[in-house]
Amino acid sequence: MPYIPHTPNDTKEMLEAIGAQDIQDLFDEIPASLQYAGFQNIPAGINEMEMLKEAQNQAQKNRNGICFIGAGCYEHHIPAAVWDIASRGEFLTAYTPYQAEASQGTLQLLYEYQTMICELTGMEVSNASMYDGATALAEAVLMAVRLNKHSKTNRVLIAGTVHPFYRETIETIVRNQHIEVITLPFDEQQGITDLGSLNQYTGEDITALVIAQPNFFGCLEQVDKMTSWAHHNKTISVACVNPTSLALLKPPGSWGEHGVDIVCGEGQPLGSPMASGGPYFGFLSTRMAHVRQMPGRIIGRTVDKDGKTGFSLTLQAREQHIRRAKATSNICTNQGLLVTAATIYMSLLGPEGLSQVATQCHQNTHELITALTQIEGVELAFKAPFFHEALIKLNQPVQYVLQQLADAGIAGGYAPEQHYPQLANTLLVCATEVRTAEDIAKYAKTLKTIMSKRGA
């Protein structure tokens, strides 16, 4: 039904009908101390022209800085064609394509997306997306627990180098499902998971192992050894990966002796703008043998009664709209529009283009680290190789440095000390393909000035 606001006369008549003098009388039972004072100063309504002027005034307060922040959300170049196509009326819809005969275009695009994700991850089947990277990993953990019929403990090992927000999301979702989450410590010299701590669980009943590649610090984990450990210990292995890195690094399906069991991650780098944190989408892929425990939509290819190729939702008996409480997941939709953009993005770039993006990210970050570590009081925090972000250690308070950089128009990075107290005064920095040599030089010059002034 349309939204029709009440007229002043409507409001007056309704208040008279219930014996109230004004709107505030409706809230008298709520103590004043619990009422939000800000609602008392809401300005009167304005017309469209005044609203546009106010929006322009507010927009002028924004500052367009040079961004060197990564930590799970990355600034990549998005070809103009991506959202020009994704915004077409044929794609720009919230409709879930249950009616296959009327949705062949959308279904084929989702099918192509699944194929691309499988090619990137080295797996056999993908779903049509999850809400974001964090919930995709949480769903992957739940899926791993369902898959491991031999385990009686529901104990899940998660590398401490997995994104802290992802680990918090997992804790939130599994805490009431009789699943014990154990965080593995990391080597504070290398910046990767301490394999000695992992080996302590050899022979024990461990349900699943979660590995990040690259990890939160940007470092490259010893994924072959960790995956092989999981296989020999009859533990389901879960890989949480950055899709951009897969254009250069070994796909999770080839890790160790047999590859991982489940792959998931954040799809934002594939054509979605940073957009203040969302919306994004998560991806999840696995082995065909595990498909019936996979959450979310799956699109399949089939033939119609005339023998023509067609596409439809398949294996729907796993899902909430059919199985209700017995479904593999409470997720009953997908991030279709973001997946549409990701499919167009990957199609436009192709394998060679994705490889060029990943290579440029890798080179830019190494050039950035080389420039920054030449400054007195700045050093690389970890020894392990890194992909397109890295942690630097400062001899000055990190919040002071970040504020000074911000004043100079530079978003200088992410301070992880709130999650890792042992990493005080460190800064996680990232340089994707959009950062130029001039951007890197400006960052280095500005940081050098800040460090020298504070030191003096």
Curated annotation (Swiss-Prot):
Belongs to the GcvP family. N-terminal subunit subfamily. SUPFAM superfamilies: PLP-dependent transferases. It comes from Legionella pneumophila (strain Corby). GO terms for biological process: glycine decarboxylation via glycine cleavage system; nucleoside metabolic process. The glycine cleavage system catalyzes the degradation of glycine. The P protein binds the alpha-amino group of glycine through its pyridoxal phosphate cofactor; CO(2) is released and the remaining methylamine moiety is then transferred to the lipoamide cofactor of the H protein. GO terms for molecular function: glycine dehydrogenase (decarboxylating) activity. The gene is gcvPA. The keyword Oxidoreductase applies. This is Probable glycine dehydrogenase (decarboxylating) subunit 1. The lineage of its organism: Bacteria, Pseudomonadati, Pseudomonadota, Gammaproteobacteria, Legionellales.
